[in-house]
Amino acid sequence: MTARRPTRFAKGELNVYRAPRDVTDVTRALRSTGRRVVLVPTMGALHEGHLTLIRAAKRVQGAVVVVSIFVNPLQFGAGEDLDAYPRTLDDDLAALRAEGVEIAFTPTVGDMYPYGTRTSVHPGPLGDDLEGASRPGHFAGVLTVVCKLLHIVRPDRAFFGEKDYQQLVLIRQMVTDLNIDTRIVGVPTVREADGLALSSRNRYLDEVEREQAGALSAALLAGMYAASNGAAATLDAARAVLDEVPAIEVDYLQVRDPMLGPVPHEGAARLLVAARLGQTRLLDNIAVDIGASDGIDGHPRVGSPDHQLPWRN
């Protein structure tokens, strides 16, 4: 039986691997030289939001950044067109080269699930709430693929955007509950000039819908300003903005604690919205401070002279 050749890695270049074993071998070798392996999981169709995650990952001292590009079929449910999801691998790899990324992991479905989908990670009760109520099985698919990526790459840290906030909370829950030795880093949402959260789905909006979509971020800001008056006032203010755009079909608008438990009487919380505009489903969220005259952890409250808005509408 012949020995397996070491997988090639060229420092300072973009190295593209499809086989999970190749990525495992290369990252293990890099760790042995003192490099810190960090992971940015994506489904491709890269935009400025993804690039912001990559830049945050590159700031880790001694980091070698692994970006995975994999359209995961497990997280698509009935009525969600997996085949229609944008696949722009050549453009994505060009963007990674421009950012100085050294490893791209681009497996096929067969590479990731060679024995089918016989084992999965169950997200628990939170997986059936909020997004999970509208997309049964979605978070089991997300956690399964993220768990596999963390075991394949063995990163010191993995970076995820706060736009998909429930996903971020569930991944942190999984890493804690399954004793996975990776630090999960949340990165603030990247937005367009009018506040719309960057998303691969935004390309499906027509010109009129794109203008209307700005109401989601406007609603979040209205809720954030009203939060000193309590959770009900937060929701009322946000809902009033959304009601001005009848084309927006709201799925949910809720205030929860930062771990998505019941809303606190006072203190740090999260305002979350999901809505459909035409054929496009949009998500957004923002941190709010419920019912307190001072800001969270001593920061100025929204509306105070010292407060800086996260974006302008």
UniProtKB/Swiss-Prot annotation:
> Where's it found, cell-wise?
Cytoplasm
Q: What is this protein called?
A: Pantothenate synthetase
- Keyword Cytoplasm, does the record have it? yes
- The top EC class, named as a word, is ligase
Major localisation: cytoplasm
Name the family.
Answer: Belongs to the pantothenate synthetase family.
EC number(s) on record? 6.3.2.1
What parts of the sequence cross the membrane?
Answer: none
- UniProt keyword annotation of Metal-binding present: no
Further remarks about this protein from its record:
The reaction proceeds by a bi uni uni bi ping pong mechanism.
| Its biological purpose | Catalyzes the condensation of pantoate with beta-alanine in an ATP-dependent reaction via a pantoyl-adenylate intermediate.
Binding-site residues for (R)-pantoate, renumbered to this chain? Q75, Q167
Q: Which gene encodes it?
A: panC
What's a Gene Ontology MF term here?
pantoate-beta-alanine ligase activity
Q: Pathway, per Swiss-Prot/TrEMBL?
A: Cofactor biosynthesis; (R)-pantothenate biosynthesis; (R)-pantothenate from (R)-pantoate and beta-alanine: step 1/1
Catalytic reaction(s) noted = (R)-pantoate + beta-alanine + ATP = (R)-pantothenate + AMP + diphosphate + H(+)
Under the heading Pfam families, the entry gives: Pantoate_ligase
Question: Can you tell me which residues bind ATP?
Answer: 43-50, 161-164, 190, 198-201
Coiled-coil ranges from the UniProt annotation: none
Keyword entries, A-Z: ATP-binding, Cytoplasm, Ligase, Nucleotide-binding, Pantothenate biosynthesis
Biological process terms from the Gene Ontology for this record are: pantothenate biosynthetic process
- The active-site annotation reads H50 (proton donor)
User: Binding residues for beta-alanine, per the UniProt record?
Assistant: Q75
Q: Name one GO cellular component term.
A: cytosol
Query: Subunit structure, per the record?
Result: Homodimer.
